[in-house]
């Protein structure tokens, strides 16, 4: 309920009570009702994200977890209910767009500026149902927070998911929170001869700060 705490309507409050009752009757231990933080941060912090996993959630920004090398995407409530009930779901395998980012961040530029620049170029529907694969020297040197920021915004260009190959900082982060060794992780990498539906290149050397504003 992290996006709606405290409940702002009677309907929301009643819905949350139904969920809490369900959690208790099903003895679900991994639940974060309130006071924990936003799920996009809490889920990886609690060690619930690993590379190579398929993760779905009832929020469009579930794609955040691609920063950790997972295929992660949001879906509707009905689809997610079926995942809960059956443990299965159906996907059309998305084509991939390679987004290579080169150059170095200057003191006035953050990963949010980079992703806003990318979205501005490709458009809000330019990557619809595609995988946005972020790579390049600028991505390789980027920390956990910056990577999460970029993958979080993949949906804003229509992408099915955003994903990055985990670097050492990400791997160490995951190992610390899951208690696993690097050798136990299923780190997925693109083949050197991988074929993409489109390739885009962004040099951030001279990039300026960006501000997003409503399109209407």
Predicted regions and their residues:
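Fe-S-dependent hydro-lyases/dehydratases of central metabolism
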Residues: 1-216
């Amino acid at each position: 309920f992290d996006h709606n705490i405290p409940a702002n309507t009677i309907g929301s409050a009643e819905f949350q009570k139904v969920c809490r009752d369900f959690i208790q009757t099903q003895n679900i231990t991994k639940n974060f009702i309130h006071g924990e933080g936003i799920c996009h941060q809490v889920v990886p912090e609690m060690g619930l994200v690993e590379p190579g996993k398929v993760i779905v959630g009832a929020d469009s920004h579930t794609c955040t977890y691609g920063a950790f090398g997972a295929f992660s995407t949001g879906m509707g409530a009905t689809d997610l209910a079926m995942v809960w009930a059956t443990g299965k779901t159906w996907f059309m395998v998305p084509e991939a767009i390679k987004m290579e980012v080169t150059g170095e961040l200057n003191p006035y530029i953050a990963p949010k500026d980079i992703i806003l620049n990318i979205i501005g170029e490709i458009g809000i529907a330019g990557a619809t149902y595609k995988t946005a694969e972020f790579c390049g020297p600028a991505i390789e040197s980027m920390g956990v927070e910056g990577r999460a920021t970029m993958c979080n915004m993949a949906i804003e260009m229509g992408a099915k998911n955003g994903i990055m190959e985990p670097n050492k900082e990400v791997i160490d982060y995951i190992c610390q929170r899951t208690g696993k060794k690097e050798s136990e992780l299923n780190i997925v990498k693109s083949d050197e001869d991988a074929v993409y539906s489109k390739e885009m290149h962004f040099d951030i050397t001279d990039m300026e700060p960006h501000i997003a504003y409503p399109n209407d």
